[in-house]
Structure formats: structure tokens, C-alpha cells
Swiss-Prot record:
Keywords: Cell cycle, Cell division, Chaperone, Cytoplasm, Isomerase, Rotamase. Signal peptide: none annotated. It comes from the Bacteria. GO terms for biological process: 'de novo' cotranslational protein folding; cell division; chaperone-mediated protein folding; protein transport; protein unfolding. The gene is tig. Its EC number is 5.2.1.8. One of its GO terms (cellular component) is cytoplasm. GO terms for molecular function: peptidyl-prolyl cis-trans isomerase activity; protein folding chaperone; ribosome binding. The keyword Chaperone applies. It is an enzyme of class 5 (isomerase). It catalyses: [protein]-peptidylproline (omega=180) = [protein]-peptidylproline (omega=0). This is Trigger factor.
Amino acid sequence: MTVSFEKTSDTKGTLSFSIDQETIKTGLDKAFNKVKANISVPGFRKGKISRQMFNKMYGEEALFEEALNAVLPTAYDAAVKEAAIEPVAQPKIDVAKMEKGSDWELTAEVVVKPTITLGDYKDLTVEVDATKEVTDEEVETRLTNAQNNLAELAVKETAAENGDTVVIDFVGSVDGVEFEGGKGSNHSLELGSGQFIPGFEEQLIGTKAGETVEVKVTFPENYQAEDLAGKEALFVTTVNEVKAKELPELDDELAKDIDEEVETLEELKAKFRKELEESKSEAYDDAVETAAIEAAVANAEIKEIPEEMIHEEVHRAMNEFLGGMQQQGISPEMYFQITGTSEDDLHKQYEADADKRVRTNLVIEAIAAAESFTTSDEEVKAEIEDLAGQYNMPVEQVEKLLPVDMLKHDIAMKKAVEVIATTAKVK
């Protein structure tokens, strides 16, 4: 195979390669075996025409296109490997020469990864809006939330206050006409929870059981029901009951109800503090990592990012997200219906920061290459086991789905991120 690659820009070039006679013969054999099944010739049963008779009747050239389709993927991959390039999109392939008895010559217009000039990526100084410190107030807030979760609702005769729960009947209308989904009965609504349209809950503060009030609101402009978006509505609302939370006593008994692994309130506070320390420490490390990566990317120089890489990243991110939804039993159609969005909306959402994600991945890849990371079989095995546990899949299935080269690439990327993050200093 003869191979050459000539760049026409930083991210585009022409790959020229040939297909030798032995490979062509293999392709012709495959092509003949495929097409002969549909050929009927007098004197032969359908599909039983000989190769010699076929060549005499149609000419061997009739098999060229099918033969090329059979051998091109392997030939192109071999040419790419020999030229040591990394295409990032499907090539545009043209046949330069295809004659009987000669090697076939082809050209492919390919898009490749851009040249990356790294700047500083170690010992970077970064600022983060995060802290590992856990305050007494945070522990008390966690405790109060747990106490609230075990609160009981008791009917009250006085007026509803923010935080109370009202049990209501309501009928909504726009311009005097009731609309679908605008009616409810014995609906429990915690005032201040933000469950209803903005402005609705505030108008029920001060009401008492047995009262009927007219609640006037305006639907948000981005409301999922387009026929209601931006419109004024009237809800005739009857308050059936007003209930207030009765908080349990904050003592050792409540502590045991909240967490059966503790015996006292002080033990519960200590456990909450430890959990907060762990979560805040993780969030702090994530913030440092993010800031350090952003700094390393900013220090690098990339001449241009091909549009094809942006498009590929958008589709990859969308497929990953929708695939995750399907694992939870939510089909794409169901997701778009629930959220009131469309595939175009999701595309625009991921397109907004696709350039940043591609740029970041390119720089991290370049750092991994600069550090010449190697990956052991033990590391690959550990990565497979980690993924199997993460996605609740058998190890064997992960091994089939993910090629070793891809796993090694991902491990190298993680090592590059670790170098960037662990050497960073926080201002």
C-alpha cells in the first residue's frame, strides 16, 4: 500500500492511498459471491452462474464498485494508521484510478485534530468559591431539616401562614373559560414551597378554613402549555383546611428516629458534621480541579476547532443524556413530552458549550501525550470493574462494549486531569 498525506490547513488534508492486487482479488471474490445469488442465466440455476461466465457476460469491471465497498473500510483504516493521523469525521473519498490489472488509487479529504500548543498546566494558581470548613450553622440547618421531615400536620383554626399547608379546591379560567388541568379538589399545598404558579401561594396567606378567594396570576412566558404561556388566569379557590407543622422535640429520642445508628443527639450532630465535611471536601476538590483545568485550557493555543468536532460532540452529549434517561425507563419521546421541549431544544442546549468541551478534551489529551502516560493491564481491569459497578452491568458485557484502546485513552485522560489538579495551588 502506498500512502501519503498532504495538509491543506491545520485541520484538513488529502490522504492518498492505494489498494493492492491481492486485496482487490479478495474484494472481487466477495462481490461475486454477493451478486451471483440474484443472477439468472439460461442454462444455469439462479445463483449458480460461474465466475468465468459472469466475466464473459458482464465483464469483471461490473464487480468493481461492490468489491471496493467490501475492502475500503479496512484499506482506509490501514492508510490512516500508516499516515499517523487522527480523523475526526467521515472522509469524502474519491477514486482516482480503478483499472483492471492495476492497483486502485484513491484520495480521501479528511478532517483531523488541530495542532495544540500547550502552555503551563502544572503548579497553576487558582481561585475557587468553595471551602472545606463546616460551620455550626450548617450542622444546625441539617438537623432542622431532619426535624422538619418528621413533623406532623395538625389542623389549626387561625389564618394560614407561610410554611403552613392548606387543603384546597380550585377552578382555573382564562378570559372566563376553564382550561384543561386547571381544576383540583382536596389538594394539599405547602405555602412557600413554590409548587404552584408564581404569586398563587402568597395570595392564600391569611386565609382561613371555609373561605373562598379569587387568586389572580399570570402564567410564565416559558410555561410548558403554550396556549397558556403569558396569559392572566383566575383561580376560584376554596380553603377546606389549614394545617400547621408540629415539630417533634429535638432530643435523644428524635435523634434515634432520624438515624437508628446513633444513640444521642450529640452523636447525630457529630455524624452530620462528618458527612458535611466529606461532601464539602469533595466539592472543594472538584472546584479546584475545574478551575485548574480551565486555567490550563486558557494557557494553551489551538488555531481552529473543526465544525465537525463540534457537531460530533453535540450528538455524543445528546445520545449520552438520552441513553441515561432510557436506563431510567424514560424514552426520548416521553422526556420531551414531560419537559415540554424538543430535540432541537436539546441540541441547542448542548451546542451552547460544545466548543468549550471539545477544547478542554483536546488540551487534556495533549497533556496526556506530553506526559507519556502508560496504562497497565491491572489499571484497565480496575477501570472495567469500576464501570461495571457504576452502571450495574456484568464485567463481561463492559469488556465487549468498550475496546481496550478506548479504556486506555480514558485512563490517560484521568491521569492528565490528576496532574493538573493535584499540582494546583489555591490563592
